[in-house]
Amino acid sequence: MQQEVVLALLAKEPSHGYQLRARLRQALGPVGEAMNAGQVYVVLTRLEKAGLVTTERPERPNPAKTAKDPADRKTYVLTPQGQQRVAEWLTEVSWPKPDLAEFHLKLVAAAAAGLADPLGIVDTQRRELLRRLREAQRAAMAEPDGSDAALLLEGIVLRLQADLRWLEACERSWTTRRSTS
Amino acid sequence: MTTAEPRLALATRGLTKTYGDGESLVRAVDAVDLEVARGETVAVMGPSGCGKSTLLHLVGGLDRPSSGEIDLAGRRIDRLGERALARLRRTDVGFVFQAFHLMDELTVVENVELPALLAGHSPRRARARAMALLDRVGVEHKAGSLPTALSGGQRQRVAVARALSNEPVLVLADEPTGNLDSAATLDVLRLFEELHESGQTLVIVTHDERIAATADRLITMRDGAFVDETRLTGGTSGRLGALAGFES
């Protein structure tokens, strides 16, 4: 998980680790299910070392009220450098990179060496993408209207659809090449 | 006591539809063998002109095959006369189309009750059934509206309610999400899922990978024939995080 994500979640108000975790769960829904409970704390520790976050402890801990995990007793606060990093991160342009070249070259190499049928490779890939699409679509269908996670799932679904359309183009192209060679 | 319900809602053997002859002969549907179990949702995908819509028209009795057999719930329908075929289309099959095909001069509830009235049910019974169906698809509050006052997703819900009017053996859908945006598509997919859970048999031809991915079985069609079949059932892999680029 990117440090900036946790940093930005902390920008709302000083928070305990478990509160940050709850906000992540809320925003990610089923996408965040595989998230390890300790991950947020690992990131927070790194952020603290980097001087982007400081911690405050309650002056007189009340054993009845405090959480079991000692890390949960701390309140995390953004430092001025942390604030600045969040502001920078929000204006940065970044976008996940799709890696199409490797798959494309796999088809080209398989056909050139006569190692495998490119159409067979396309088929296998298509089934895998359809399985992933099924999973994302089912998760999207289970979300209530207007949930944050539903919007994220829609993004996953649309990207998978785009990949599937490209596979269709691959199939058409390799079918034509096979029949004309 | 009649015999047990047949296991298959639909079966075709060697189903073929050709147009033209000689040099210009086109095999729109070419010797298709298809079996659809009761309660199954089957999606048929393929490029434009692959014959998937023609296939749907043949099994729904909207068009006649050149050769081959069609069994609907254990009954041969490929040799039915015109009148019997018209009755079959009204009572045994429900259609859902891309462009909804609702009658714009009739209200929503009048559209939905029409098939029941045509099948000879009393107006009172047809209306009650239509209202129950509109309730089921979540647009009962629009019963008195004209279809043009509804969103695309709502219109498709009404079309689905109409398709269910006579409790058909089979619901056939032709590009049901073709005219819908992303949110309305999700809505229709949820509705199909509900139908599936209630045991309705569905055959959907579509370009939309989202429908294909939610079906029990996906058939790929090319040049009038089935070229691939994939069963997509299975549990979750828990990889949604990775799919979102959210590495855990």
Question: Where is each model-derived feature located?
Answer:
Chain B
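ABC-family P-loop ATPase nucleotide-binding domain
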Residues: M1-T18, R231-S248
